[in-house]
Amino acid sequence: MAPQYEHGVLFYHQHSGLNKIHEGLGEVTVALTQLCKRFTIQLSENEGDIEKYCQRIQDQDNREGIDVLFILGGDGTVNELINGVLKYNLNLPVGIIPGGTFNDFAKTLNLSTKAGPASQDLLLASPQKYDVMKVEDQYVLNFAGIGLMVQNAENVQGQSKDLFGKLSYIMSTLKTLSNPKPFNYTLDIDGRTYTGETSMLLFANGRFIGGGKIPLMEMSPSDGELNTFIFNNYSMSILKDIFSLRDSMTWSEISDNIDHIPSRHVHVKTEPPMRVDIDGEIALDTPVDIEIIPQAIELLTVEPGQAKDN
């Protein structure tokens, strides 16, 4: 096939989630060099390196002629590149190659869940515009969560999530659900106020969270809306189904236990102050402002059914 791009850059972390990173890079490179006339691989050694590279592209007026960016990693790593692209107004399409435990947004893009097949999928992909969440000053592709999601992440101790993958995460979930910690919330959503007690709040752009699919067909990461979910304290069995990757659920099964509020801007206050999980990274505390930025980024997307492992 003829290359579609002049110069592509692939970013990766040494600890990207692939067991044998250099073998994985070789497989990915075979595919991406078919897409790009010139192809550069860039190791990110420290947090913030990817954003600095994006800043350099802007500062140098993109003198290297880069016209596509790729990222190998999980959702948190992907967000590093998304933040760099948006903060420095690069206006470049991004190709995502899964390299973490769940890679939720890669599923939204109809990509395979493994790096090698996903890089082959990108040969069939085309850029499509997607919304992006903004949580305080951070851009986020997929979700922000408060309560049980943070408890769950903190229960996955040390390296266990990387070593044992989904099994470790699910076992942690079962532990978390047996000991939920309720909190009080005040949500100011587009001029309306909601108050109450819950064990979990979820703010979602994508349709996959922690490997499971939110069973709401009309959800779309390109509709200009943020999806706010307030979980009933008595819906522990429902939460277990969602976290345990049960794909057969329908919204009618859970709508009595979860309030869904389409929104654009949300101000979140909790009592006591709570940690906030942003695509698997716990970096903020309430209160926080969350908004949706419509059509903010171009991501390489495959038509449904074309992915190698579908």
Question: How would you name each of these model-derived features?
Answer:
Residues G76-L92:
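Short Gly/Thr/Asp-enriched flexible loops that form oxyanion-binding sites at enzyme active sites
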Residues I21, I189, T195, S220, ...:
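ATP/nucleoside-binding phosphotransfer catalytic cores, i.e., glycine-rich phosphate-binding loops
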Residues Q14, L72-G74, G99:
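Glycine-rich beta-strand-to-loop/alpha-helix junction loops that act as flexible
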Residues L35, K87-S199:
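Catalytic core of DAGKc-family lipid kinases
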